[in-house]
């Protein structure tokens, strides 16, 4: 099957739009399944909208734009990956005179700091690499803020300490900033360790769906709701303007220690009307370009690629997913307060998607737990079959749009079972414990070193744009 053949495109379209007919048939043959039917119609409509919109997505090509860039890399216990992360950045196809790198060791307990010093000497980059070491672990958000305050570039590029960028990723990532209303850009993510088992490969193709399909759709509306930490970029002045708000976010009266990337995206996507930054030279407050929530744009660049190390063991994967589910809850609540100001297509797709995410858990419980316990096991099989069909369509579209190999289709279908399991377990637990947080993916045996901080909150950090962070009085 040729992905570029018009017949292939028509076949995928027929399979996508044709998914409405089984739903209508189910409604006729099972009039009692109103909830399932209503949910299925909305979900199918959203999926069709997503495929139609993402099909027309095109990344911005390289037009020669080369602003001054500051790359910020917060690191916590990444001795195995940090050298390669930095080496990839310094091998980037970007003018040396316009690229600085700031790495912040956030209280690592392994040899991360030694590796940072080693790579600076090995690469011979001198003062192009600034190394900062926190005496103790303060969290990713605080580490990133330190880098933001030290940065001199017009554009901030944020990269996770276990992510590896393509040689042309940075130059392609900054191209959308030629539009002055673009405040943030999300790069494309993929798994770096697909050779380490089935679980990493499942995640790799799930990333392709979430990035190329869903972020591609959001980018058509210029409203990408989460710039992934593995590769993203922001205008520095925009981040400085919201830095205090970001550092001092709370949830249920506690400092927010998760969802750093999603919340930063929210703050710049909300617009910068009435925001100021303080001049480092004379201390004057300078107004930032006043963008309303309707005008501020966050987009996706599928051609700017970074590869990240994904979990290889199920317990590690589940801890990561729990952190992500909790951050999604926080981010959804905060984004819901302003997304209605966006153009109608962006607002409608956002609220519909959030409704479907939470509705999916309720529907999963009813059709996979309640109805089988009532003796109706067929309903559970029908529900799983529907999810597998949707995943099959996602795999087809990833194969066609991302030029992925054909194995993308079965792996995407296979991830359905993990997704359903997450809806029935991790997502529900995240709902019940949304106040908990921390980089629990990196914590041994599921413990959380932030628990003491959560139980006894320290004074919130107030950003001093011309110096170090100081506790609020």
Description of each model-found segment:
Residues 1-12:
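N-terminal membrane topogenic signal
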Residues 332-353:
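Flexible internal linker/loop segments at domain or repeat junctions
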Residues 228, 236, 440-473:
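Short linear elements at protein peripheries
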Residues 316-326, 331, 411-451:
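Membrane-proximal soluble regions of multi-pass membrane proteins
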Residues 63-339, 462, 470-472:
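Non-transmembrane catalytic domains and loops of membrane-associated enzymes and transporters
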Residues 10-20:
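Alpha-helical transmembrane segments
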Residues 71-82, 419-431, 449-467:
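Cytosolic juxtamembrane regulatory segments of multi-pass membrane proteins
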Residues 22-56, 61-64, 350-437:
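Membrane-embedded multi-pass helical conduit in multi-pass membrane proteins
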């Amino acid at each position: 099957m040729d992905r570029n053949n018009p017949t292939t495109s028509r076949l995928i379209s027929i399979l996508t739009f044709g998914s409405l007919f089984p739903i209508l048939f189910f409604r006729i043959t099972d009039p009692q399944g109103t909830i399932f039917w209503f949910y299925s119609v909305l979900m199918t409509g959203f999926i069709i909208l997503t495929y139609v919109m993402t099909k027309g997505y095109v990344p911005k090509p390289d037009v020669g734009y080369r602003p001054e860039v500051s790359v910020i890399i917060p690191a916590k216990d990444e001795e195995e990956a940090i050298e390669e992360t930095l080496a990839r950045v310094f091998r980037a196809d970007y003018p040396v005179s316009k690229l600085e790198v700031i790495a912040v060791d956030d209280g690592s307990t392994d040899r991360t700091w030694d590796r940072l010093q080693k790579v600076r000497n090995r690469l011979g980059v001198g003062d192009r690499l600034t190394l900062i070491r926190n005496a103790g672990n303060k969290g990713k958000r605080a580490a990133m803020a330190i880098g933001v305050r030290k940065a001199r570039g017009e554009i901030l590029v944020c990269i996770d300490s276990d992510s590896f960028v393509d040689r042309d990723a940075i130059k392609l990532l900054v191209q959308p900033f030629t539009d002055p209303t673009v405040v943030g850009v999300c790069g494309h993510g993929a798994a770096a360790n697909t050779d380490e088992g089935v679980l990493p490969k499942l995640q790799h193709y799930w990333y392709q769906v979430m990035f190329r399909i869903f972020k591609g759709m959001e980018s058509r509306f210029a409203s990408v709701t989460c710039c992934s930490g593995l590769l993203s970029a922001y205008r520095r002045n925009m981040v400085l303007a919201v830095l205090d708000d970001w550092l001092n976010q709370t949830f249920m009266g506690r400092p927010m220690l998760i969802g750093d990337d999603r919340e930063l995206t929210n703050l710049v996507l909300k617009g910068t009307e009435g925001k100021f930054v303080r001049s480092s030279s004379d201390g004057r407050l300078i107004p930032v370009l006043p963008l309303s929530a309707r005008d501020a744009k966050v987009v996706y660049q599928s051609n700017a690629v970074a590869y990240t190390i994904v979990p290889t063991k199920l317990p590690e994967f589940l801890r990561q997913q729990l952190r992500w589910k909790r951050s999604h809850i926080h981010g959804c609540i905060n984004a819901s307060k302003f997304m209605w100001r966006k153009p109608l297509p962006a607002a409608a797709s956002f609220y519909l998607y959030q409704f479907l995410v939470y509705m999916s858990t309720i529907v999963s419980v009813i059709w996979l737990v309640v109805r089988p316990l009532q003796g109706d096991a067929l309903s559970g099989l029908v529900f799983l079959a529907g999810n597998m069909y949707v995943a099959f369509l996602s795999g087809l579209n990833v194969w066609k749009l991302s030029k992925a190999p054909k194995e993308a289709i079965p792996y995407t279908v296979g991830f359905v079972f993990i997704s359903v399991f997450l809806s029935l377990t991790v997502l529900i637990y995240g709902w019940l414990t949304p106040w908990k947080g921390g980089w629990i993916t990196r914590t041994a045996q599921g413990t959380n070193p932030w628990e003491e901080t959560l139980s006894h909150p320290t004074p919130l950090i107030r950003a001093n744009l011309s110096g170090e962070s100081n506790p609020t009085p």
